Amino acid sequence: MLKLRNAFSLMLIFLFVMSISACKPNALTNQPGVSTQESASDSVVNVNELETPTSETEETDQRIPVIFSHDGAPDDIAALLYLSKNPEIEIIGVINSYGEQDPRASSQEWAAYLYEVLDLDAVPLAVGSGTPLDPSGYEFPESWRIAANKFWDVELPASNAAIDSRAGYQLIIDLIKTSPEKITLLVTGAQTDIALALQHDPQIENNIERIVIMGGAFYSAGNLNGNAGEASNAVAEWNIFVDALAAKQVFNSGIPLTIVPLDGSKNFWITHDMAGQLAGGKDAGVQLLSQLWEKQFNIWNGDFLLWDIPAAVAITDPEYFTWENGKLDVISEVGERHGQTIVFNAVNENNEFAVSNDNEELSTHILDIILER
């Protein structure tokens, strides 16, 4: 009996030891070059845990196709440089439009800027209408037009680049109709070529995402400042004033509008401090803008205002502005209110206009984009 009890005890001890051994980790697991089922499973990537692109990411990566219609003002030179540097924008066409320049006279200078300085060789440049739709005959002062036609005496490289043979409005139509996605129009001069495009082919409005406009003054005074010849007008802004009829047609087209009027672009001063940040830049576009701003300091005897480049910013970065909505219109009848932009109480969510901006943040953003920092 004693022997049987001892044997039974030994068996219990043996089973206890074996159970402890089974609980110990396999010593081979941590040895290099030895694979076990457990270590192999640890190295397998779980595809469900991978970060995959989302539709939101894809939309963020997609650039906005933009047609830029300008009238050759100094701010347009800055605006085009900004557009070319903005990674969220794809410039698909440029129109030399009516306004501060004669579109034909300045076309070769703008071709040199577009193709030789900014290297935008794939972007077509077309000449817009040289006369407004509005029969009033109002125009910018002659001295301004002469300066604009000479690209403000800024030195440009020689260029034999061909200008698109199509009329400005026709290039707009063709680009919109052939685009796989909706187009954004940025207009910083008169609305002449946009109105002509809509007259010739009204169906293009279906492929226009939005028209972004620098023009008008809703709550602010106008900026003619007695320079409009015999016209006595304290309420109009130049871009609307010189072709109020075209502006009225665009405003009433039903296409969503984003307006940066004098209200939303006022007090955007170019200072010596801002210009100093361009100095020493190796980029050809930055060097040209630096040269232009130095000339503008001499013309204005100090700091000067820009209006068009804030409108370019509004395409991708509306957060720098305060916005209101409404039904918008333009007074096109000849008289003291010719070219005045007005807003009705009836709210139209498709239309928005800026009533103010954050000057400091806006300036920093523009320089960050232009200087690619």
PLM-predicted stretches and their roles:
Residues M1-M11:
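Bacterial N-terminal signal peptides that target proteins for export
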Residues S19-A22:
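C-terminal motif of bacterial Sec signal peptides marking the signal peptidase cleavage site
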Residues K24-N26:
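Bacterial signal peptide processing site
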Residues G33-I64:
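N-terminal low-complexity, Pro/Thr/Ser-rich intrinsically disordered segments
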Residues L50, E59-I64, A79-I91, W238-F241, ...:
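Conformational coupling and interaction surfaces
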Residues E58-H70, P74-A112, P157-I259, S265:
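Active-site histidine-anchored catalytic micro-motif
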Residues A126-S159:
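Surface-exposed loop and adjacent secondary-structure segments within mature catalytic domains
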Residues S129-D134, G215-F218, P261-F268, V334:
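Glycine-rich beta-alpha junction loops
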